[in-house]
A protein has these predicted regions:
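Conserved alpha/beta-hydrolase
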Residues: 66-69, 74, 78-98
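N-terminal cap/lid segment of alpha/beta-hydrolase-fold proteins
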Residues: 1-51
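Catalytic active-site module of serine/aspartate enzymes centered on a nucleophile-bearing elbow/loop
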Residues: 294-331
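Alpha/beta-hydrolase-fold enzymes
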Residues: 138, 142-228
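Short beta-strand element of the alpha/beta-hydrolase
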Residues: 54-63
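Serine-hydrolase catalytic core
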Residues: 193-295
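Alpha/beta-hydrolase active-site loop
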Residues: 104-124
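Alpha/beta-hydrolase fold nucleophile elbow
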Residues: 125-137
Length: 331
């Protein structure tokens, strides 16, 4: 669905950020109640297509129970010569305001419609000829599935702690997945737990200014506790993670970044501020081999799950690693 007639409006981040609503086809079985996504970018990006501010661009995909607010990440890309765009997917973030069940998406491929439209806007309307897809956590899984399904649409992938497998032992993953698959067919809206889900509350407390952290995001859009994990959502995630394990054959260069250490729900706030308490970094590293033939893995000491929200030294190392890699791979 083309959104060429949709105007830009001031974004919640304030100037120079603007938001553009992307209407999408409703899908009651895959993303009930969701009818739009929101593309966020700086006002200067929407200049004449013949003369974009930067020829290269990045499209950022957020994680579960998340939205785009990391303006320092955007600034790092802008300073490196990339226009920055972020897509709050249907039922998520800005596009989930007023939604009965935010982030209740049972097949991530339903997001293909808004990703396709965002890329059309970036390339055709705004005139960028090189586009990088940057995904965090669930957004990282979204990014690799998109790149595998739609070769030639993006020029590189940057993955920030991508969710490539379910945390836990092989036994937990096998039996847990079978149970979730069965439950999702009977009651996809059933709220369930998952290994690691409790860690996210400790994670938020370690990062948000209300508790012990540095950051001040909107807790209505990225709450603590996080939005419920539902059976339909997790079953959909597991289907795609199995595809990853079978091999995706992505044909563009991929950078996978993650912390050096994982921790559990029992981690102290201090430990949560310098490790990944959501995913297993060893799993991330192992599953990265199935993405394609050109994969670079970079671990960030004392990085948190969203590496862009790590402490100052780890954050700087992550951003520097990304920009150096892009400079090396995209001449």
């Amino acid at each position: 669905m083309s959104a060429t007639s949709e105007p830009t409006t001031p974004d919640i981040l304030g100037e120079p950020w603007v938001a553009r609503r992307i209407p999408v086809t409703e899908s009651p079985t895959k993303a009930p109640g969701a009818d739009h996504a929101v593309l966020v970018f700086q006002r200067e990006a929407a200049g004449r297509a013949s003369r974009p501010r930067h020829s290269r661009a990045v499209l950022y995909l957020h994680g579960r129970s998340d939205y785009f607010f990391q303006t320092h990440l955007a600034q790092a890309y802008l300073d490196a010569g990339f226009e920055f765009y972020a897509l709050d997917l249907r039922a998520c973030g800005r596009a989930g305001v007023g939604h009965a069940s935010p982030h209740d998406v049972r097949d991530l491929r339903v997001h293909d419609e808004e990703i396709s439209e965002a890329l059309r806007i970036i390339r055709s309307e705004h005139g960028h000829d090189v586009v990088v897809l940057n995904g965090h956590s669930t957004g990282g899984l979204q990014a690799v599935i998109w790149a595998a399904d739609h070769p030639g649409t993006v020029d590189a992938l940057v993955l920030n702690s991508p969710w490539l497998d379910l945390r836990g032992s092989a036994l937990v993953r096998s039996y847990g997945s079978a149970f979730v698959d069965l439950l999702s067919r009977r009651d996809p809206e059933r709220v369930i737990g998952e290994p690691g889900s409790g860690d996210e509350d400790n994670y938020v407390a370690a990062l948000h200014r209300r508790w012990r952290g540095e950051w001040d995001w909107d807790l209505a859009l990225k709450p603590a506790p996080s939005f419920p994990v539902r059976a339909g959502f997790l079953a959909g995630i597991r289907r795609l993670q199995r595809e990853v394990h079978h091999g995706l054959g992505i044909r563009v260069p991929i950078l996978v970044c993650c912390s050096t250490v994982s921790n559990s729900v029992k981690a102290t706030l201090e430990e949560a501020q310098r490790s990944d308490v959501v995913l297993d970094v060893e799993q991330i590293i192992d599953r990265s081999q199935y993405l394609g033939d050109d994969v670079t893995v970079r671990q960030i000491p004392e990085g948190v799950h969203d590496l862009a929200l790590s402490g100052p030294l780890a954050r700087a190392e992550y951003l520097q690693a990304v920009m150096r890699w892009l400079d090396n791979r995209l001449h």
